[in-house]
Amino acid sequence: MKSIFVFGIGLLAATANVSADETVRYVALVNGGSAKAGHQWVTKGSDGTTTVDFDFKDNGRGPTLKEEYKLGADGTFVTYHVTGTSEIGAPVDESFAREGDKVHWKSTSDKGEQPVQGTALYTPLGGTPQGLSVAIAALANRVDGKLPLIPSGTLSFRKLADAEVSNGGATRQVQLVAITGIGFTPTTAWVTKDASPRLFAFIFPGFLQLIEEGYEKDGAALETQQKVAEKKLLGAMQERLAHPLAGTTLIRNARIFDSEKATLGAASDVLIENSRIISISDGGTEKRKAAHVIDAGGRVLLPGLFDMHAHFGPWDGGLHLAAGVTSIRDMGNNNETLQQFIAQEQSGALLAPHVIPAGFIEGDSPNAAQGGFVIKNLDEAKHAVDWYHEHGYPQVKIYNSFPKAILPDVTAYAHSKGMRVSGHIPVFLRAQDAVEDGYDEIQHINQVLLNFLVDDKTDTRTPERFYLPAEKVAGLDFDSKQVQDFIALLVRHKTVIDPTLTTFDFIRQRDGDMSQAYIAVADHVPPDVQRNWHVGTMKIPDDAAYARYQKSYEKMIDFTGRMYKAGIPLVAGTDAVAGFTLQRELELYVQAGITPAQALQIATYNGAKYARVLDDRGVIMQGKRADLILVDGDPTKDIADIRKVALVVKGDKAYYPSEIDEALGIKPFAQPVTVK
């Protein structure tokens, strides 16, 4: 499961406004507040120096950071320093200083200096969530409500809601604010209602509650209130960006991609009514009048794309739709929160793709990922399967700490309910064991290739599941009997592979280098996002290790192509930044020797087939749901053209990716094809 701690984009760094030698303590709770996962301790010394001790661990990984800084009279950093380790072990060492009208900074990813006039706040790359306190307090002192940022950008915020919390009989007032100017979407936080406000709680609904110690019991109520406030913001986005298609809609002169055959046809007319395709005819021949007309102008019309490995958050919807993703499979989430998102999407109130849920089941351990159900025995595992079946989930996803002894019984039980079973490989097993025990699908290329690297003592609940493939895949002989026998096993069992190649780009990214996963879109995103994409999360000790990790990643791509050519089904998933990552994933399939048309087939037909919605969508034909995308260029010849989405139709609504992109601070990739 992906981490929500993306330092430098959603959050800033450090804190302020506590009395001398006073420590404010925060506790980090996950999975709806049910489990403790870390802490944040903030102390202001008598000399004006503030220190922050931050540690967070979930899913066997997480950052450990120590910050120290001093503030100027305007509440912004004069000096700042953070050290520690990132989510997967990369060193963090970043410093900043202001001397009059000049500032300079240096981190493991970048360095710079620039002149500055007046108030401006430095935004660290490696900071903690606590920096919201500095930003909010500094913003509160700004008459214009805007705070210039270093190296670039401007921060602003507005109040969304008020609440009362209590501790030991004493009550206090807090408020929810939405902070904009960093990243693609607002960051929401609960802050104190003081002359100098500070962070009270940072809540990521369904996953994290970072809340002041002693107020843990208020976390659930604050999370519920935050969901209501965010629902209003998201509903306003949907109302602004969705274009209703009442009555009939005619798409003229579109070249239809046949996702079942992976071929591109001649220009056609497509007539839509009540979210369904009611007829397809030769281009220019449809004579019936329609309430809405879309002139495709010979562009390619594809079924909406499927992202088969997402962990949906409500602000992800715009990025998905702008990239042509109209359906996602959620591979692990807080169950209550995900059910709410699904209901909002189905009601038309949420800017989002369709969500097909996979039920997350983890085993209880110190390294467990806290989401879905965390079980200890067979009875609890069966209860989880029952709950997911009763709520319409077509499959379950098993995770790292799942008890290996009960795996055959649980897969058999899920199959008896008509459900598919997929997941990571439980610790102390190999992929071939999981397949023989009933897995229908395996998530992630590292989980596949660990089959040849682990022994009965390898703890894949830790970051070893990343470092071992990075070190060893480079030396694997894919033509060896062991590897060929494993490929034959996957073919024989018709095992589906969800490789998520793009998300593993991090194993070969050195600090300071732009992530190759996003280099093709970097010029389109805000500068702070570009800067963050230069941050490496992997500890790469020297040039020799970098060369090994690079070769290992290239061989992961190669192995994906070998599996496909052997007849092993693939689905296209991401487990990373919504939208952009799926487009890069398809490029990597082509790099693996898969044709562009076949890559598009994987992202459409295969997605619908293995999400079990092929009877509803995934193919452009009469009777199917009108989930469609118009693309400039020809992605069946040049897969990079898949980024040029000019129009998205999702049932009874149309979306212009250019409008969504502009709302998110992204430079559009194509001119819109508008509905007349």
Which residues make up each language-model segment?
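Contiguous hydrophobic, core-forming segments of folded domains
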Residues: 62-130, 183-196, 200-212
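Acidic, glycine-enriched loop/beta-strand segments at the rims
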Residues: 166, 239-241, 256-269, 282, ...
